Amino acid sequence: MELSYRLFICLLLWGSTELCYPQPLWLLQGGASHPETSVQPVLVECQEATLMVMVSKDLFGTGKLIRAADLTLGPEACEPLVSMDTEDVVRFEVGLHECGNSMQVTDDALVYSTFLLHDPRPVGNLSIVRTNRAEIPIECRYPRQGNVSSQAILPTWLPFRTTVFSEEKLTFSLRLMEENWNAEKRSPTFHLGDAAHLQAEIHTGSHVPLRLFVDHCVATPTPDQNASPYHTIVDFHGCLVDGLTDASSAFKVPRPGPDTLQFTVDVFHFANDSRNMIYITCHLKVTLAEQDPDELNKACSFSKPSNSWFPVEGSADICQCCNKGDCGTPSHSRRQPHVMSQWSRSASRNRRHVTEEADVTVGPLIFLDRRGDHEVEQWALPSDTSVVLLGVGLAVVVSLTLTAVILVLTRRCRTASHPVSASE
């Protein structure tokens, strides 16, 4: 049981931690050469604008070959390239922005994330499968100081007002951070009882100051924010409703800066869902930093000691609507996909009401057993009391057995020493 559990975690974390191997298996830098194909079951080549994935049909190393039809890439389930059944490798070749791949910006890199899914289905009229379902995260990292394009970057000295008229898009990011908030979390694994530290950011370059808000967040077992089951973390234009329950989830006060917003979420997993992983999708938006927070643009947490809501900044009145669950008319439904809007020409004439929005996903967050939960250990290794009781029970059984044997032998001896005469 322990071996299969470790194999499951290895398949999920291959290339992300040192649980299975000291070096990542398929996390390659842009332009890096890939290792020998005979060593690894999955190889990834991050090219200038495309992603190439090569999967060995002996994916699990058991000799049981998988079928190419059972493999897909990304949330949009892109199919592999057509290949001969006799080939030992299944190949994918897609654009970096295809198949639903997500892009995040860190301090030093552009990160494109996706996953390889092996979902075996019964063949013909059979109702069984002989291989396991596996979801393998894949990342391509490109240094921000470099240029992934073959065309040179030309400097521009356009002021912000001109950039607004050019309808420039801003860059949003959502990252998992270490507990001290000083660095990005290296491993996506958590124990129940931990808190996930999330940091939302807006990258604006040298433009005028902007203030970032988390409008709403939802957790799902897949990268699709419309999947079921789901759990709402932030709602009603900035109310961190996850803190209403038995969780201590809250926004961090004060925020590091107007362009950054940090918050913690007590980790969880969906009941009756064997995947033990979640993805968190947040709808981020910005306003001008000089604009005061209001009911539509706020960051509010719930305080259990005072049984009230409080904001990261601004008047406490802007959080009162969190109690009613009605904080104004939403720009779009929380559960509907949203495409990043652009700065409009008409809105730029009145910049006080201009906002920019985007949906950003982070994950998977993978959950192990509870901290301090020794049920598995108790199941595997009996406690001292159990050992004593087991020993006493065995001693009683042995004693009763010996007593029965002695009684039988004694009766036979008595019968042999007093034979019954036929004449009598």
UniProtKB/Swiss-Prot annotation:
UniProt xrefs under InterPro entries: ZP-C, ZP-C_dom, ZP-N, ZP_chr, ZP_dom, ZP_dom_CS
Entry GO MF terms: acrosin binding; carbohydrate binding; extracellular matrix structural constituent; identical protein binding; receptor ligand activity; structural constituent of egg coat
Subcellular location: Cell membrane
Signal peptide: 1-22
UniProt entry tagged with the keyword Secreted: yes
Residue segments, region Disordered: 330-356
GO cellular component, one term: extracellular region
Tissue specificity as recorded in UniProt: Expressed in oocytes (at protein level).
Modified positions (Pyrrolidone carboxylic acid) in chain numbering: Q23
Disulphide bonds in the chain: C46-C140, C78-C99, C217-C282, C239-C300
Record keyword Secreted present: yes
Sorted UniProt keywords: Cell membrane, Cleavage on pair of basic residues, Disease variant, Disulfide bond, Extracellular matrix, Fertilization, Glycoprotein, Membrane, Pyrrolidone carboxylic acid, Receptor, Secreted, Signal, Transmembrane, Transmembrane helix
Glycosylation sites: N125, N147, T156, T162, T163, N272
Family annotation (PROSITE patterns): ZP_1, ZP_2
Recorded superkingdom: Eukaryota
PTM comment, free text: Proteolytically cleaved before the transmembrane segment to yield the secreted ectodomain incorporated in the zona pellucida.
Complex and partners: Polymers of ZP2 and ZP3 organized into long filaments cross-linked by ZP1 homodimers. Interacts with ZP1 and ZP2.
Domain notes: The ZP domain is involved in the polymerization of the ZP proteins to form the zona pellucida.
Disease with which this protein is associated in UniProt: Oocyte/zygote/embryo maturation arrest 3: An autosomal dominant infertility disorder characterized by abnormal oocytes that lack the zona pellucida, and oocytes degeneration.
Family listed: Belongs to the ZP domain family. ZPC subfamily.
Protein name (Swiss-Prot/TrEMBL): Zona pellucida sperm-binding protein 3
Biological source species: Homo sapiens
